[in-house]
């Protein structure tokens, strides 16, 4: 397969555009942390976040701010990471279906592997062979030679991979011994499947667990395997005997994370019950409750700078990562104060972590306001914030206020069609635009708070404007294709290039650091870049291959979509005593204000009726010709009422708002008119 290889199939697949509203530098994990890797040589900890970001931290306790850098290229949860090549290279697996290869020291992505067709959930690493395996929900296991991956370049971008077949269900855990002779997978099939990665031959299938196998470890020579399952048990397997040789019932709920010491004599376990235990594999009755976290445990990483390990790092569904000391654990065992009596449990060895890498808040709730432009959010700290989807920014932090009250406070009797969707999976606002409804929302410039240079009040398409802002730096959007030939002539004659089409949309810009993502509707990412980087040569070329035609139409060809039309019927109200008209079906822009319909009634229906009943003098005709539009508007409001469902309508309402809030029925909208009683 080819790293960075993207087939030019944008015309055949359904491509969506997404962007993330966020700060330029996101220093803190904004969601749970799925994986950890420790580099003891450089005193660095790598965290793989559900916010899609891999962060590097200093574990030097004397450093006031532990944050070093962020590694950003994924677009969904990062599920697993492994450090290779003595800490020089990091491999990551993500729910965006990719495996990425990083320069761990400099923090940049070197290549992207796209062989998986679904979430990549687990990685395994054979240190002696520099071999990495990846697996996920597509039931596939791929083997990668790390030295080959790190040698990839723009011209040499092809890498071969071996695959292990035979899994019948989604894979959630993977392990490979250091020597690279055995690989084991765990899945929702509730069995362990074992292969020889050198030949890709299936060796065995081990049965015993009754639920998903979430964690796996192998000893150095690949003769023993530890497994943790959602069934709440830890099992020790002999691969030589092809059977389970011990079962440890330590936890009250599912076991999601395991670590083991070098000698493979003590297992550290954590999971849904938030407790972390150390269990003696030779004597299962000897187990020590090390600590209790505040959230379910997702991953652990032993500090192996000494033997026995002096500490363990723990990641949970919360955004902070804790380091717990293990220094007193041996005295604890020697004294006999271990937890072998469930009816009279011993308190944990540690009540406070030794070190905390503080996390940030995650957005857990949102409400799109009626104007379909602003969003209210609530985070894990109960703070409420107000956001502008169009400008891709936070407008205001409202603090710890009542979320529902804020929604009520900002309610407006206005209807704008849905034109985007919101996802909170990463703990940040991800906005997605889809061809099916992206151009559904038209508003007037005045209502949107924008002024036009000529003082007019044009109708603006929100989705169209936003796409133009997101791709403002892409050179292809700067020159209308019709003017390219003429522009080249100007360039040749005058020595300068003339931009005939302004950059962006002329009304607003989005923050240049905004991540823009092109992906298939099923969730598979095609290309991610920062808004400001679309002017780069490589990025521009990839945009040419990736941007779908429906986006090209708006951003490059400047073809704005047509207005939405709404059909309706106009009839005299029953109280007016007027004869019911022939039921003609009318049609108008759904943004047409009620006052314009009132003017139509006054001018075309009421005036015509009056003229047919009286003989008009030439003076009256002359006066009628001089009557201004403004006068008609004033007279219409003075003399005419428009009703829907017997409710008098506000002249400032538009037809779509009337249909949504007042008509509320199937079929075409019906409006009634009557003259106001004098």
From Swiss-Prot:
GO terms for biological process: DNA damage response; double-strand break repair via homologous recombination; embryonic organ development; homeostasis of number of cells; multicellular organism growth; positive regulation of double-strand break repair via homologous recombination; positive regulation of epithelial cell proliferation; positive regulation of receptor signaling pathway via JAK-STAT. It is found in: Nucleus; Cytoplasm; Lysosome; Late endosome. Its main location: nucleus. PROSITE patterns: WD_REPEATS_1, WD_REPEATS_2, WD_REPEATS_REGION. It comes from the Eukaryota. Residues 608-629 are annotated as: Disordered. CDD domains: Ubl_WDR48 (cd17041), WD40 (cd00200). SUPFAM superfamilies: WD40 repeat-like (SSF50978). Residues 610-621 have a biased composition (Low complexity). GO terms for molecular function: deubiquitinase activator activity; DNA binding; double-stranded DNA binding; single-stranded DNA binding; ubiquitin binding. Keywords: Cytoplasm, DNA damage, DNA repair, DNA-binding, Endosome, Lysosome, Nucleus, Repeat, Ubl conjugation pathway, WD repeat. GO terms for cellular component: late endosome; lysosome; nucleus. WD repeats lie at residues 28-67, 73-112, 115-154, 166-205, 208-247, 250-289, 292-334, 358-452. Regulator of deubiquitinating complexes, which acts as a strong activator of USP1, USP12 and USP46. Enhances the USP1-mediated deubiquitination of FANCD2; USP1 being almost inactive by itself. Activates deubiquitination by increasing the catalytic turnover without increasing the affinity of deubiquitinating enzymes for the substrate. Also activates deubiquitinating activity of complexes containing USP12. Docks at the distal end of the USP12 fingers domain and induces a cascade of structural changes leading to the activation of the enzyme. The WD repeats are required for the interaction with deubiquitinating enzymes USP1, USP12 and USP46. This is WD repeat-containing protein 48.
